[in-house]
Every structure is written in C-alpha cells, then in structure tokens.
Design a protein with these regions (language model features):
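Active-site-adjacent structural elements in enzyme catalytic domains
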Residues: 8
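Amphipathic/coiled-coil alpha-helical interface segments used
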Residues: 18-21, 29-32, 36-211
C-alpha cells in the first residue's frame, strides 16, 4: 500500500473510531514488523478488532504496540493474536491490556525456568513441553494447548490456582481460568485477508463526500 493509502486508512480510523492517526500508524507498523504482514492486512485487523469492541477501554492500539512481540514469541500469528484477544474479551474482560500481559507473563516464565515446577505439578513432561514451546509456531501452540488442557482439567482447586499463578503471574488472579482458557483459543472470524479496511474506507469516504 502506498503512503497516501496508509495515511487515508489512518484518517478513516480516526473518523470512525476516534483513533489518533499517529497511534494507528504506529500500531499498524508494529503488526507489519512483528508478524511480517502488509500494512493493508494490519489495518484490516485493527478495524475488525475495533468492530469486535476491543477498544472499549481505549487500549487496543497500546496493546498492539506493547504485546505484538509477546504473541509472536509464543508462536502466534497476527490473526491468532486478534482472535485470542476477542475470545478473552468475550468472557467479560474488556481491559485487553491485561490479556496481553498474561501472554507476556507466560512467555517470561516459560523462558526463565520458573514454569518448570508448575508444569511438573500438572503432570506434564516438562522438558518435552519446554522444548516444544521453544520451537515457536504451531509446535509452541500445541505445547500451550497441552498446558491449558492440564490446567482446566486439574480437579485440585489449590493446585490449579498455584499452577495458574505460577504460569501467568498475577494476571491469573485477575482473569481466572475461563478467561485465560478463552484467551489461549485462536479460533475466530478475524482475518487479515478480509477487506474490512476497504469497506471502512469507502463508507468513511462516502460520509465525508455527503457531509
């Protein structure tokens, strides 16, 4: 996309959602840098995120800027990230900054060895799970899936709580098992290949023309 088109997109986001133009450009840039997608795809995702209500607390663009690297490091795509945030938010957590923070805390604990004892307590093969997580991409996602399954199926409430906090930090206390499980679900309708931005552009342009 040309610079003119990118700027036009950012202005349309300002008109429709009240997003600051510079912040929109920065968020789109974060997405292209971290996930290797095009500017057009980045704007498609931002539009769909806003349409899903992810900016209820005015923290969508900040969350993209701050946490894209964390989702990428955990093996997720840009599409995954937006669907995860939408799924987490649907459980009633509209402060999506907290959802991003949960992924960040999890990454740190998986990387620095803090997670090991909790993975063991959940009955997982720690070495295997960590090695799989460190491969990134689908391998990492599969490892995370195993961890979430073990957490959800844990009948011992005390152990579940300890392991949850051990893996996700204080975000586990803030969010709870259902929200974290939803957050770790990548299924959803948000796609970078949609034409959400083009549709918004034409609608915003029509409005400007007629006003």
């Amino acid at each position: 996309a040309s610079l003119a088109q990118i700027t036009k997109n950012a202005i349309a986001l300002e008109d429709v959602f009240g997003f600051d133009v510079v912040e929109s450009l920065r968020a789109a840039n974060s997405l292209t840098d971290q996930f290797g997608i095009s500017a057009e795809e980045a704007f498609n995702l931002i539009v769909q995120g806003a349409q899903k209500g992810l900016n209820q607390n005015d923290d969508l663009l900040d969350t993209i800027n701050e946490y894209s690297v964390q989702f990428r490091n955990a093996g997720y795509s840009a599409d995954d990230m937006f669907n995860m945030l939408a799924n987490g938010a649907e459980t009633g957590t509209w402060s999506i900054d907290k959802l991003g923070d949960a992924v960040k805390e999890f990454n740190i604990r998986m990387s620095d060895g803090t997670a090991n004892e909790y993975l063991e307590q959940l009955g997982l093969n720690t070495e295997e799970v960590i090695a799989q997580f460190n491969k990134g991409g689908p391998e990492a996602q599969a490892a995370i899936g195993d961890i979430m399954e073990a957490l959800q199926e844990c009948d011992d409430a005390t152990l579940q709580y300890q392991a949850g906090v051990g893996l996700f930090g204080t975000m586990w206390e803030d969010l709870g098992v259902d929200t974290v499980a939803s957050l770790m679900d990548t299924q959803g309708a948000i796609q970078s290949t949609s034409d959400a931005m083009a549709q918004l552009d034409s609608a915003a342009y029509d409005t400007l023309e007629s006003s």
